[in-house]
Regions:
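Conserved SAM-binding loop
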Residues: 192-193
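Flexible mid-to-C-terminal extensions adjoining Fe-S/redox cofactors in radical SAM and related proteins
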Residues: 188-189, 201
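S-adenosyl-L-methionine
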Residues: 1-3, 197-201
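Core catalytic lobe of class I
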Residues: 1-182, 187
């Protein structure tokens, strides 16, 4: 990313890979990588662009891994401001889960704080929505993120540097944004190119 500066009007919607997707790093190596990757994404996004992270906590090696905290720590290191922190339910409230949290974090960071947000959206989303694949962000979560960008930012281009099957990109296109994804897996790239979502307004 450092070799390809972001154009003006860029914002990011992404979900950083889980340790299960990078087993070669080991747990401690993944935690270090996660923090550096989050910082790189935040650093790359130009003002007044926003960065939105969608992350799900896990239990690994007997400890709870709060990815929302890891992202916020990276943002503090880069001098970014947290505009909001929403919870997206992956399972109905009251569900007992083992290994992975039944909710996800959706966090929005900016270069500068904002005194007022006109269209804040809900703090808790009852369902992430349709997922084109198992690790997808969920269409409803993507819609919430894209709606906020449309109503509260100067965004023209949405970038997902870990795009997977391209859910965030497809929803961004639906909301009128140009969208660009980065993905190392050729299989996932092919899936992203094929993805078409039928969405209402």
């Amino acid at each position: 990313m450092a070799e390809h500066p972001a154009p003006a009007g860029t914002s990011v919607i992404t979900s950083l890979p889980d340790v299960s997707e990078l087993p070669e790093l080991g747990f401690s190596g993944w935690k270090s990588w996660f923090g550096e990757a989050a910082r790189a994404v935040l650093r790359w996004t130009p003002a007044p662009g926003l960065v939105l992270f969608f992350q799900s906590d896990i239990r690994e090696s007997g400890e709870w891994v709060d990815k929302g905290y890891l992202v916020q720590r990276a943002a503090e290191a880069e001098g970014r401001r947290l505009l909001w922190h929403k919870v997206v339910c992956r399972r109905p409230p009251g569900t007992i889960s083992h290994g992975r949290a039944s909710y996800s974090h959706l966090l929005c960071f900016a270069h500068e704080p904002r005194a007022r947000i006109t269209h804040p959206g809900p703090d808790v989303l009852p369902d992430a929505g349709y997922k084109p694949w198992s690790k997808a962000m969920g269409v409803d979560a993507c819609r919430l993120a894209c709606r906020f960008l449309r109503e509260e930012s100067e965004t023209k281009l949405v970038v997902d540097p870990f795009c997977g099957h391209g859910t965030a990109l497809a929803v961004a296109n639906h909301y009128g944004f140009d969208a660009l994804g980065v993905e190392l897996s050729t299989r996932k790239v092919r899936a992203a190119k094929r993805l078409v979502l039928e969405l209402d307004v």
